[in-house]
Amino acid sequence: MSQTNDQITEQIKNRRTFAIISHPDAGKTTLTEKFLLYGGAINLAGTVKGRKAAKHAVSDWMEIEKERGISVTSSAMQFNYEGFFINILDTPGHQDFSEDTYRTLMAADSAVMVIDGSKGVEAQTIKLFKVCVMRHIPIFTFINKFDREARDPYELLDEIEEVLGIRTCPVNWPIGCGKNFKGVYDRFTKKVTTFTAAQGGAKEVATQEFDAETNDVESIIGFQYHQQLLDDIELLDGASDELDMDRVQKGDLSPVFFGSALTNFGVETFLEHFLKMTTPPLPRKTLTGVVDPFNKDFSAFVFKIQANMNKAHRDRIAFMRIVSGKFEAGMEVNHVQGGKKIRLTQPQQLMAQDRKIVEEAYAGDIIGVFDPGIFSIGDTLCASNEKFEFEGIPTFAPEHFARVRQVDTMKRKQFIKGVNQIAQEGAIQIFQEFNTGMEEIIVGVVGVLQFEVLTYRLQNEYNVEVILEKLPYEYIRWVENPQEVDVARIQGTSDMKRIKDLKDNPLLLFINSWSVGMVLERNPGLKLSEFGNN
């Protein structure tokens, strides 16, 4: 059935596309599953409490993920909640994440930052936060695990502001913590919501709501907690930043919520506030202008490629974020980088291994299409009567490096095919020393688990056994101005190595940050970057 422009506009207005970022074990996967639970997308939230839990989280599906109880790949999940169509971009939250995690943030219109209430701001959160800042997208904070002993909430807010450099505005406030976690106070409705923990966190919880200053609240949470709450309200109203939505949309101010994803304390309250505050699909820059999401013509970009999601399928899926207009199954589009028109058949939306064929989708949605090997990260697709390119997705600096070669030299062809395909998906980056061939390469990854993923996939999907020799380098920099400097004549340190990527762009490897600074000092005019351009 054809739709009017007004109907398409209404569909787009109701889209919300966001990523959830966190340090390992801060509760990101649990929060994601509770969102899906409230949206009716799953009936029972899969507990990820223990690494050896028999039930695996909904978003874990690769063999290596099942063995470890972690989420190696970044999945996209869609559900509906109170009139909103929500796309969650799930990012790996375990000890070793990949460049995929960074790239997923390129498809998000906002981010939810999950922080462990007992630990505060941690290393991986800082890295992911920097990418959100680079994109100027709104960042909402959920301080989790208040069902356990947690740090002082004022102290946590100070740490967010000092370490991350973003101002905060608490939207709700915790009443107690640990066994004495009574509920949350909403600073804008002036209501206290108390909770009864659900068994195993599996079902929606019953809630009660009271005016903060009434005797009903005091009788439920106790005199001491009630007095503390009244003092906190007075202090927050006088000292905290006001909720200025212009500052929120620019990424200068983060609304903060407290709760416990495991026991559902504060989760639905957070979800409701967040959906009202966060943006519908945002415009996106092209090389020549900007594409408005409400433009009737379809456009999208590829931000992730996943091969062999299911051995029964032996397939490769390109995930794309729709930027504007309406998508219809079977429509013909321009694949700009490929230089030809293609037909997008059997588009899918995913819930882990479960695939659903979609007939239509709108700006803000994430769809997966079968990739016969023609797509690369950052590719633009647009209506057949259009031709433009979205700004490329940057290549992020790996932090771990290894020399990789095949054991059986007769399998060189399979080795080259395998590493190239895995690199094209964006799981690894391939580098070479100058004057060497592909029989021995240097692989760079953002998280060391990707080395395990690489050897596992080469063995299982390409029947190639490899020897992997880890290298001591931790820093890599692209030479930004190779036309102005002779890379071979750069005055380096004893630990510096000159390499190139598959596009012959020159790069430098270093063991420590001191060497990076020293090389810049010794070579006036040399420009180095942590990001490569695609």
Please identify what each model-predicted range represents:
Residues M1-N534:
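Structural and coupling elements of P-loop NTPases
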